[in-house]
């Protein structure tokens, strides 16, 4: 499973809200030797794949042309809407 991701330049509550209104959501990749990276993902691409068991195994994120293998660590969902608010990924 492969998703396109973009490194976030704006961080914080307001920037995250703007992402969500634009049909995207914030995420972070951490673990391993490299530093943590804040990214943004397209909500429709991810939410359609979340009900598949393969989603919770290994995922490949393409960030600026580089492929990073990750595993979902935590998912924060909206309280009553079927939306993802934020995700944490751990490097493999």
From Swiss-Prot:
Which one Pfam family would you cite for this protein?
Ribosomal_L25p
Q: What intrachain disulfides are recorded? A: none
GO term, biological process aspect, one: translation
Any idea which UniProt keywords this protein has? Ribonucleoprotein, Ribosomal protein, RNA-binding, rRNA-binding
Q: Which InterPro entries match?
A: Rbsml_bL25/Gln-tRNA_synth_N (IPR020056), Ribosomal_bL25/Gln-tRNA_synth (IPR011035), Ribosomal_bL25_short (IPR020055), Ribosomal_L25_dom (IPR029751), Ribosomal_uL5_bac-type (IPR020930)
Against SUPFAM superfamilies, the record matches this protein to: Ribosomal protein L25-like
> Which GO terms fall under molecular function for this chain's record?
5S rRNA binding; structural constituent of ribosome
Q: Name one GO cellular component term.
A: cytosolic large ribosomal subunit
Highest rank taxon of the organism: Bacteria
> Subunit structure, per the record?
Part of the 50S ribosomal subunit; part of the 5S rRNA/L5/L18/L25 subcomplex. Contacts the 5S rRNA. Binds to the 5S rRNA independently of L5 and L18.
Give the protein family.
Answer: Belongs to the bacterial ribosomal protein bL25 family.
Q: What does this protein do?
A: This is one of the proteins that binds to the 5S RNA in the ribosome where it forms part of the central protuberance.
Name of protein: Large ribosomal subunit protein bL25
Whose protein is this, by species? Vibrio atlanticus (strain LGP32) (Vibrio splendidus (strain Mel32))
Classification from the root reads: Bacteria, Pseudomonadati, Pseudomonadota, Gammaproteobacteria, Vibrionales
């Amino acid at each position: 499973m492969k998703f396109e991701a973009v490194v976030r330049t704006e961080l914080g509550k307001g920037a995250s809200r703007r992402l969500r209104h634009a049909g995207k959501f914030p995420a972070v990749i951490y673990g391993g030797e490299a530093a943590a990276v804040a990214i943004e993902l397209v909500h429709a691409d991810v939410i359609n794949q979340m009900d598949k068991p393969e989603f919770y195994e290994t995922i490949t994120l393409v960030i600026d042309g580089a492929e990073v293998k990750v595993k979902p660590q935590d998912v924060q969902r909206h309280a009553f809407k079927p939306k993802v608010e934020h995700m944490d990924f751990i490097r493999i």
